[in-house]
Amino acid sequence: MIRFRRRTCITLSIFIFLVCLIMAGLKHLRPENAAFGSPFGLGLFPGFHRASVLEKIPDSENHLKGNTVTETNTLPAPKDKVYQLDMEEFPPPNYDLHIFYYTWYGNPQFDGKYIHWNHPLLKHWDAKIANSFPLGKHNPPDDVGANFYPELGPYSSRDPSVIDAHMKQIRSSSVGVISVSWYPPGISDDNGEPTDDFIPSILDKAHSYGLKVNFHIEPYRNRDDYSLRNNVVYIIDKYGSHPAFYKYKTDNGRTLPMFYIYDSYITTPGTWANLLTSSGSQSIRNTPYDGIFMALLVEEKHKHDILRGGFDGFYTYFATNGFSYGSSHQHWSSLKEFCNTNNLLFIPSVGPGYIDTSIRPWNFQNTRNRINGKYYETAINAALLVRPKIISITSFNEWHEGTQIEAAIPKKTAQMKYEDYLPHKPNIYLELTRKWSEKYMKEKEHWLV
């Protein structure tokens, strides 16, 4: 009996020792090439409630079970632990880091149909090339108009739980300003529906996370100096008093709202001068509706048009290095010099990569591989070299063009396999953004010395 008890004690001791050894090993594990280690394990970033969104789409889970294989090498984050973060656990928001945000997505639960996820395949303008590629529309939830698949599934931009998840992701990345894609009330892009009605929800939720919001005004039919003046008056009157409404402090001490004007070059400089110069017929300068107006620079010649048009500066938007003069990193130094000489604000735009072959199957030459985050880091580093006052990110969720930093998951169906962020976790680009945001803030302190 004594011998049996001794044997039992020895066996139990060995078992306990092995358990302790395994626990100690697990405690010190982390990905070899992770900049900060696992963001989930460190508790740095909030998790993302994919289930809370997908459960609202009745057909989605059935499709996932029957027709798809979801592949992932990552473990699911412990939802309760990761999601329940106090505000002080987020990194400080960097209000000099802006991110382009799109509100045009819809699904049957919230919008009565899929919007934008079922994007059509766009036809090439050259008939000879167009004949070599298919036409048609995507068929969500498994077939969406994107080369990557969102962790939240084909969501609705007006879903309160999605807005909350997005604000958490953005705040976790240390970005401070959301540049929301905007059309006037009752107007939308060709594949969307009007979205101005839920801007208040975005402002409210952004404020709850300490974020600011400005407006990225999209091109619409007959946009000109007169209509844009009406847009600015509407935005400032309706949203200007909201605590989340972003205002930029100028060198002379004024605080003014900032507007990005997408595709500004399609309108003549003379027309813009009517609105943006002090002597213009529609001038808003030195009125309650004055602001910082950022033009889009694509070609080199646009910088002179932008100056004549009365803009306060320009941004480059495209996340495709080499695609345009403005998006090419090698030109940022000369563009910044031009802005310094002419008292303009230069905002370079950086992005994690580019791929839009899900909607433009013929446009493979403009694909920019993410290279596991290296492309993104190279772009941000190039931006920092010119010491910009603001950097913009293209984008949080432009899924059609594959520029998103929003969380994405591996997924494949019987017909296709989506691109993914492996070997990294779904939030790797949020983590990289945080890393570089902190570097940006530290470097700016030295620039000001």
From Swiss-Prot:
Gene3D superfamilies named among the record's database cross-references? Glycosidases
- Do you know which Pfam families this protein is assigned to? Glyco_hydro_99
Q: Which InterPro entries match?
A: Glyco_Hydrolase_99
Residue ranges, Lumenal compartment?
30-449
Output the Gene Ontology terms for molecular function: alpha-mannosidase activity; glycoprotein endo-alpha-1,2-mannosidase activity
CDD domains according to UniProt: GH99
* Keyword Hydrolase part of the UniProt annotation: yes
Record carries keyword Zinc-finger: no
Catalyzed reactions: N-{alpha-Glc-(1->3)-alpha-Man-(1->2)-alpha-Man-(1->2)-alpha-Man-(1->3)-[alpha-Man-(1->2)-alpha-Man-(1->3)-[alpha-Man-(1->2)-alpha-Man-(1->6)]-alpha-Man-(1->6)]-beta-Man-(1->4)-beta-GlcNAc-(1->4)-beta-GlcNAc}-L-asparaginyl-[protein] + H2O = alpha-D-glucosyl-(1->3)-D-mannopyranose + N(4)-{alpha-D-Man-(1->2)-alpha-D-Man-(1->3)-[alpha-D-Man-(1->2)-alpha-D-Man-(1->3)-[alpha-D-Man-(1->2)-alpha-D-Man-(1->6)]-alpha-D-Man-(1->6)]-beta-D-Man-(1->4)-beta-D-GlaNAc-(1->4)-beta-D-GlcNAc}-L-asparaginyl-[protein] (N-glucan mannose isomer 8A1,2,3B1,2)
Q: Which UniProt keywords apply?
A: Golgi apparatus, Hydrolase, Membrane, Signal-anchor, Transmembrane, Transmembrane helix
Q: Which family is this sequence assigned to?
A: Belongs to the glycosyl hydrolase 99 family.
Output this protein's name: Glycoprotein endo-alpha-1,2-mannosidase
